[in-house]
């Protein structure tokens, strides 16, 4: 960037800087707010995390295929991304994601992919006004119950062992032009977590591929729906042929705890 701006050669700075700081202060983490498609470049320079505004923009637009394309990046890149729905330079998430349903679906995607999840103060309450750093206070707001419930759902998923210590993979949709975003967290000795979100503006009936879940018969337990307390059993053959089938409203989501049966 400096070379392009000032038209003169520059010595690489960040690697030397980060190495020197870490030599004196081991364990220091560095996060870069970076744009212009230079996220991977700064990760390679030694930054622990880089802002992922690409995912943020694509969640706003509701283009499911572009979201999937971004999430197909290498695991090493993904785990160094900062996922967010709001930051200091943008309107608050409750304003940018204009419906609680859009907010919830986008939130579950950002929270259930690898990387660091960044949440601002009051974001989980559905607050729409920025707090004033200069006045050291925030304007009074009532917040929003649907937003609070969405963050409560996400916190339940984040507490699961598979989400904390497992491996992640995207679950591709079955069929073309699907708005469905699917992913799976797996951890040996624990149940897996599967999430499917309709990242679109119309009702979606479809399925995502079951991936490794199709290797054996499975027992699926809904994470969000208290009206369905009993687990559902699915045969491996059915999972291979039909995948995980869903019927979801715009930005609706389903999450399952999945136990593979012997």
Q: What do these predicted regions represent?
A:
Residues 1-262:
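Active-site and adjacent substrate-binding regions of carbohydrate-active enzymes
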């Amino acid at each position: 960037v400096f070379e392009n701006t000032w038209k003169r050669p520059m010595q690489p700075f960040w690697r030397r800087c980060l190495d020197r700081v870490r030599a004196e202060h081991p364990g220091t983490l560095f996060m870069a707010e970076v744009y212009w498609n230079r996220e991977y470049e700064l990760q390679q320079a030694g930054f622990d995390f880089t802002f992922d505004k690409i995912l943020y923009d694509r969640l706003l637009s509701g283009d499911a295929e572009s979201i999937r394309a971004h999430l197909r990046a290498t695991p090493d890149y993904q785990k160094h991304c900062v996922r967010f729905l709001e930051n200091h330079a943008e309107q608050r998430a409750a304003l940018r994601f204009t419906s609680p349903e859009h907010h919830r679906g986008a939130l579950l995607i950002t929270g259930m992919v690898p990387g660091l999840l960044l949440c601002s103060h009051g974001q989980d309450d559905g607050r729409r006004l920025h707090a004033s750093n200069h006045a050291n206070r925030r304007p009074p707001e009532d917040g929003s119950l649907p937003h609070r419930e969405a963050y409560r759902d996400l916190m339940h998923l984040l507490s699961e062992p598979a989400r904390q210590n497992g491996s992640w993979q995207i679950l591709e949709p079955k069929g073309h032009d699907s708005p469905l975003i699917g992913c799976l967290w797996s951890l040996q000795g624990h149940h897996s977590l599967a999430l499917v979100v309709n990242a679109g503006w119309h009702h979606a009936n479809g399925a995502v591929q079951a991936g490794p879940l199709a290797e054996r018969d499975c027992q699926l337990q809904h994470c969000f729906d208290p009206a369905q307390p009993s687990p559902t059993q699915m045969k491996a053959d059915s999972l291979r042929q039909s995948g995980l089938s869903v019927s979801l409203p715009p930005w609706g989501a389903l999450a399952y705890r999945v136990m593979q049966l012997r």
